[in-house]
Amino acid sequence: MQDLKTSLVEVFGKTNLVESFDELTLTVGSQNIIKTCLKLRDFFSFDTLIDLCGVDYLTYGQSDWNGNASASGFSRGRSHQGLKDIHEERFAVVYHLLSVSKNKRIRVKSFVDEVEPIIKSVTDIWASADWYEREAFDLMGILFENHTDLRRILTDYGFTGHPLRKDFPMIGEVEMRYDEDLCRVIYEKVSIEPNVNVPRVIRK
């Protein structure tokens, strides 16, 4: 781990690299994502993209829960004090890379614009990014430039919005049911009320 960290610092700089829980996270600007990923693949042998996802930091450090978060168990968390200013940028794309030959992993994080969340596709670098990028587009609304087939992959064809965004209502916008009179599936405005049942916590 230390040898990899030293080599990465020499190439990308110390300020862009963070080590936490025996994992390395490299943060790069969205305009440099292709150049960075090529270096990681060609010079550091990160030949496999094992995961890609979008992250929405809109409500990071905030809570709708009035009680205290548990100090143990599944809902354990830490204080929200001082967390509101950690992420000024809202959307990030996170890549998890694996070097099979060296048995090393690294996380790459790149923030994108909130109004126009666009970043270049890495499908030409790792073919496995294809459906991952489609999923991030579908659920988070992040656009991947030069992706050859960027369409929804999980939600319905007529779905409106991106359901993993923090400002998307938890109850959804519409509900679907089968109408016996019309003999077809119909969409109606959602009929349930929103309710916060569990505390929002930040895992230790």
UniProtKB/Swiss-Prot annotation:
Coiled coil: none annotated. Its EC number is 7.1.1.-. It is an enzyme of class 7 (translocase). It is found in: Cell inner membrane. It is a peripheral membrane protein. One of its GO terms (molecular function) is NADH dehydrogenase (ubiquinone) activity. It catalyses: a quinone + NADH + 5 H(+)(in) = a quinol + NAD(+) + 4 H(+)(out). One of its GO terms (cellular component) is plasma membrane. The keyword Lyase does not apply. InterPro entries: NADH_DH_suC (IPR010218), NADH_quin_OxRdtase_su_C/D-like (IPR037232), NADH_UbQ_OxRdtase_30kDa_su (IPR001268), NADH_UbQ_OxRdtase_CS (IPR020396). Keywords: Cell inner membrane, Cell membrane, Membrane, NAD, Quinone, Translocase, Transport, Ubiquinone. HAMAP family: NDH1_NuoC. NDH-1 is composed of 14 different subunits. Subunits NuoB, C, D, E, F, and G constitute the peripheral sector of the complex. Belongs to the complex I 30 kDa subunit family. NDH-1 shuttles electrons from NADH, via FMN and iron-sulfur (Fe-S) centers, to quinones in the respiratory chain. The immediate electron acceptor for the enzyme in this species is believed to be ubiquinone. Couples the redox reaction to proton translocation (for every two electrons transferred, four hydrogen ions are translocated across the cytoplasmic membrane), and thus conserves the redox energy in a proton gradient. NCBIfam families: NuoC_fam (TIGR01961), PRK06074.1-1 (NF004730). This is NADH-quinone oxidoreductase subunit C. The gene is nuoC.
